[in-house]
């Protein structure tokens, strides 16, 4: 699930993933929420897990964060502290978009290039693509940290280490 949070209007997304949503699923998907916590009804998601309507879930955004539902955290395959957009690439892109919006607002129409820092090791040697991807980011590490100490949600998020996205690397077997 990746959608903005819209509370009112013709197409609200608040609790978009609710009991009705999960009941309508034809297969048992792996449910991923990386948008806004309130787009998913936590209790409906837990019931969907109980009923086998979904195979498993990966949650990066939570209702009521930083006070996250501990039952859901413990039942998630992967649970992270709202860090999906925390890569150096994501931050550079957001900075560029902000600069361009400000430039447009003031009638300057500037085009900006904001480059993230180079990764410490640009070439990744791995036997498979999965192994290569896990070497640059393993979500189970973040999940373990959050599950070990959920009260540190904001600390884990605030002190998040710099990482680059896949396109910053060259993979070789």
Give the ranges of each region predicted by the language model.
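Rossmann-like dinucleotide-binding domain for NAD(H)/NADP(H)
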Residues: 28-173
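Rossmann-like NAD(P)-binding element
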Residues: 1-16, 22-33
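Short secondary-structure boundary/capping segments
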Residues: 21-23, 69-70
